[in-house]
């Protein structure tokens, strides 16, 4: 890669980072090219050079966000041998962390635009298929290990993904009855409802000391 290409890639990354922050803060409809340029500390011309439209900016922002996330997710779960540990970690990383979770607010914008724009819909389908595939692989791994009691990993993944999405949407919107621990509890209950109960570790008695 030449120096010019390296500089270009760095500028593009800055624009994407600024756009992702602003979309999460204000929503796509409420940001302007000048807002992104100001946040990225560069000229509006640089922003439009890399991203001619806000739709293009949104698609690239969600793609970068999800690719970074899925790479991290795959690296982490591959190091876990226990199927329940893999699934629990996947849920922890995938689900919303707090109200107005930036990653989930970004997805709100993608869903809204995907309903009307075929280009955004295509990107959404691509990213959703990849993340669903990771979940399916985790469930299939647990089934093959004799731990998860399902004959249909694809359906189990679809059902569990629907629960993760549903409660994450509620938490992102600030539902008063839901916090992060409750979200994780609900996801764990859904997983066990479809995959079997997770064994409870035996309690080891402690020796009394005098």
Residue ranges and their predicted role:
Residues 10, 14, 21-56, 60:
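Helix-turn-helix
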Residues 25-29, 80, 145:
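Short coil/turn segments at alpha/beta junctions that flank glycine-rich nucleotide-binding fingerprints
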Residues 52-56, 78-81, 98-99, 115, ...:
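Residues in soluble alpha-helical coiled-coils and helical-bundle/repeat scaffolds
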Residues 60, 71-104, 156-160, 184, ...:
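Hydrophobic alpha-helical connector segments
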Residues 63-68:
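Short, basic, alpha-helical segments at the C-terminal edge of helix-turn-helix-like DNA-binding modules
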Residues 70-71, 75, 100-108, 118-144, ...:
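Amphipathic alpha-helical packing segments from all-alpha helical-bundle domains
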Residues 76, 92-98, 106-116, 190-194:
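Helix-loop "lid/cap" segments that line or gate small-molecule binding pockets
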Residues 119-125, 129, 143-191, 198-210:
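Hydrophobic/aromatic-rich alpha-helical bundle segments in the mid-to-C-terminal region
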